[in-house]
């Protein structure tokens, strides 16, 4: 009877008048269906014996419901408990045995208690009061005031402060004034050509399109004419009002036009391109599976984050599928997922080319939308070859969306993307930090050797309780690893994030930092772009970046989405580092926000005492690094043994696999890497010299330039003429 009933109601849509008890719940699990079947059979026997008593039972059951209960059909589930995006790759991870560095540090006496000099009772009380103030500020940020209450409390506390704090503030003000007046070396303009007005008018869409889009203010997402499933996804994430970049970009993207958009970090650029994509895919053919959207990102972590944003925004859209193609994760699992031809594929350039060339049943021939996140980074020389290859593989008739916080690429770079009259939308002035970011600078002068001790001192001052998330940026991965060991020996737990880690280790580091298991994350510029981890309070630049753009992306990890944040930068004496500080001060002076740039007062005596502790532990640091190296060698040897066993055991299957191909040969790879290295070491010229060189190129071959040999011969001739002239004068006098 049960199967008859299922077949009977399979092709019909039940109405309100139908009896729901007779219709089985096909979405329930097997266990639930068995228990439900027993209950229903009892009810049927009761119904057969007592015909009219069933109605009374139903009425009694409805009487137990609360008449004041209302369903929230806006899909607001998870609004209050939303804790950021998930950094988990697709598929189950294979268990890998890694070296337990924290265990080694504990065996050597680290990670027990915070080391340091003894502080007076007054300093401890000040630290506790500062911690309490920071807690109040965090509560204010989570409410509707978004930091306004905290600012008023801070203003009141500043008025009621004692004389000692006044002295400290005076010292910091003097330092800030001194910082403004410092000569940061000769101001060199970067070798960046500016597009002429004629070129821009010919390449871009009329400027009034972007200006009109920026001038329209949207108070809610309902005014953007979005469909109900998309609005439910936004409500589930707690999004109520579109940010300026979202309000300006979404209507134009929905029209199918190409877009080049730029806004400060943390302004919601990912949702700005993901919302119109999901809205467009609502009207796709239901029975034809094909990849219609390709999203390219420069880093793996950013790709995983973008995929999670898309899944959460489109969770109420039926039939919407996502695929992930990033390096470091299981290649076979990604192949299986891409065989199903997901609607949206988020990828890094190298891995997507690998899948296009070597994965069966996957193609990008039907791509309708191309999104390039962090476009200025993707247009640099490091990704140029891969990007050109991808452009040759996807259809030229498509919509292209470019997004970045420092979008200042020239038309020459954009031509390769085959853009069609793109609309240019720049919400904020280029090269500007977030409005509520406080930028502090510490001048090292001749104290470069004290940097590890200074970092530990700053971490203790900024967060003595370990309840804040602090990101430390360094230039090299070896430095990041060594700093993790040093901080561990001083009693502070820290994580690391750089390219030498496996992808599983990188994701684990991000998740530990996100859950506050590790309050300090020491990383390279790998984490400087796009990562959106909620409530990063402080960013410390241990090493200065190479350019001001990289500096903006680093400090953009904090003060996101209207929150307040702080960055502390250690500044050396090089001209390059001084010029970055000068650009930061100029940007703050020209902005209308509440951000500021100032110097930070440091107690160098305490730093020197901490430095003595670090020096005393140098032998232990060497022992830890050596022990870790030996354990890594053992793990590598075990892996090679397993690899050899698999080669012998599955020799036929391995040999039967087709060889994976690449679009470049080994010699071409070497040549491109050499060209990239030469371009990086290219000397920066100022604007006058560049214009002179351009004028000489337009004229053709430049005039002959004298060599050193020519100058010496000319000098000799001049001396001879002088001697001859002197002898003639003597003869005339005689």
Swiss-Prot record:
Keywords: ATP-binding, Coiled coil, Helicase, Hydrolase, Nucleotide-binding, Nucleus, Ribosome biogenesis, RNA-binding. GO terms for molecular function: ATP binding; ATP hydrolysis activity; RNA binding; RNA helicase activity. The keyword Nucleus applies. The keyword RNA-binding applies. A motif (Q motif) lies at residues 219-247. Residues 436-599 form the Helicase C-terminal domain. Belongs to the DEAD box helicase family. DDX27/DRS1 subfamily. Associates with pre-ribosomal particles. This is ATP-dependent RNA helicase DRS1. It comes from Eremothecium gossypii (strain ATCC 10895 / CBS 109.51 / FGSC 9923 / NRRL Y-1056) (Yeast).
């Amino acid at each position: 009877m049960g199967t008859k009933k299922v077949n009977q109601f399979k092709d019909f849509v039940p109405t309100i008048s139908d009896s729901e008890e007779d219709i089985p719940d096909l979405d329930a699990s097997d266990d639930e269906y068995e228990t439900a079947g027993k209950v229903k059979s009892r009810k049927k026997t009761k119904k057969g014996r007592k015909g009219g008593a069933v109605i009374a039972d139903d009425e009694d059951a409805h009487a137990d419901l609360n008449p004041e209960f209302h369903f929230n059909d806006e899909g607001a589930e998870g609004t209050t408990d939303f804790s950021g995006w998930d950094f988990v790759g697709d598929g189950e991870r294979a268990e890998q045995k890694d070296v337990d560095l924290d265990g080694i540090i504990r065996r050597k006496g680290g990670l027990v208690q915070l080391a340091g000099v003894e502080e007076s009772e007054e300093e401890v009380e000040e630290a506790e009061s500062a911690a309490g103030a920071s807690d109040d500020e965090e509560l204010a940020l989570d409410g509707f005031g978004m930091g306004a209450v905290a600012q008023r409390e801070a203003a009141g506390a500043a008025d009621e402060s004692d004389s000692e704090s006044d002295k400290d503030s005076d010292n910091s003000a003097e330092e800030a004034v001194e910082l403004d007046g410092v000569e940061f070396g000769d101001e060199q303009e970067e070798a960046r050509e500016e597009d002429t007005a004629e070129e821009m008018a010919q390449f871009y869409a009329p400027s009034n399109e972007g200006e009109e889009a920026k001038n329209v203010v949207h108070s809610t997402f309902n005014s953007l004419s979005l469909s109900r499933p998309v609005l439910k996804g936004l409500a589930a994430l707690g999004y109520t009002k579109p940010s300026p970049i979202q309000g300006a970009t979404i209507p134009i993207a929905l029209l199918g036009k190409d877009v080049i958009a730029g806004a400060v970090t943390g302004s919601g650029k990912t949702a700005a391109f993901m919302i119109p994509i999901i809205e467009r895919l609502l009207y796709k053919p239901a029975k034809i599976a094909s990849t219609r959207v390709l999203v390219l990102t420069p880093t793996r972590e950013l790709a995983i984050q973008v995929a999670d944003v898309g899944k959460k925004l489109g969770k109420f859209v039926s039939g919407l599928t996502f695929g992930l193609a990033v390096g470091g994760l299981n290649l076979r699992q990604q192949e299986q997922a891409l065989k199903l031809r997901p609607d949206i594929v988020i990828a890094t350039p190298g891995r997507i080319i690998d899948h296009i060339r070597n994965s069966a049943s996957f193609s990008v021939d039907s791509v309708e939308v191309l999104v390039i996140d962090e476009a200025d980074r993707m247009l640099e020389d490091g990704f140029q070859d891969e990007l050109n290859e991808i452009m040759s593989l996807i259809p030229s008739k498509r919509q292209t969306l470019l997004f970045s916080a420092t979008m200042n690429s020239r038309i020459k770079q954009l031509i390769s993307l085959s853009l069609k009259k793109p609309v240019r939308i720049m919400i904020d002035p280029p090269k500007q930090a977030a409005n509520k970011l406080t930028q502090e600078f510490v001048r090292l002068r001749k104290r470069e050797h004290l940097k590890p001790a200074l970092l530990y001192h700053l971490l203790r001052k900024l967060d003595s309780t370990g309840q804040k998330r602090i990101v430390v940026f360094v230039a090299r991965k070896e430095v990041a690893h060594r700093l993790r060991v040093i901080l561990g020996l001083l009693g502070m737990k820290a994580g690391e994030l750089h390219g030498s880690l496996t992808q599983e280790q990188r994701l684990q580091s991000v998740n530990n930092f996100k859950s506050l298991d590790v309050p300090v994350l020491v990383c390279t510029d790998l984490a400087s772009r796009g990562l959106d981890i909620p409530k990063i309070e402080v960013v410390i630049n241990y090493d200065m970046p190479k350019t001001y753009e990289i500096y903006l992306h680093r400090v953009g990890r904090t003060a996101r989405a209207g929150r307040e944040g702080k960055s502390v930068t250690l500044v050396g004496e090089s001209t390059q580092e001084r010029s970055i500080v000068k650009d930061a001060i100029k940007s703050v002076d020209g902005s209308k926000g509440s951000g500021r740039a100032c110097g930070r007062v440091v107690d160098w005596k305490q730093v020197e005492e901490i430095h003595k502790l670090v020096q005393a532990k140098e032998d232990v640091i060497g022992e830890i690094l050596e022990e870790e190296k030996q354990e890594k060698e053992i793990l590598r040897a075990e892996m090679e043994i397993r690899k050899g066993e698999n080669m012998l055991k599955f020799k036929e299957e391995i040999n039967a696999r087709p060889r994976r191909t690449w679009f470049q040969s080994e010699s071409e790879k070497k040549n491109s890497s050499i060209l990239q290295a030469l371009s990086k070491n290219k000397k920066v010229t100022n604007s006058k010299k560049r214009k002179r060189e351009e004028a000489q190129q337009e004229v053709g071959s430049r005039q002959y330039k004298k060599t050193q040999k020519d100058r010496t011969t000319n000098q000799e001739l001049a001396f001879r003429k002088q001697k001859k002239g002197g002898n003639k004068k003597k003869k005339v006098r005689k």
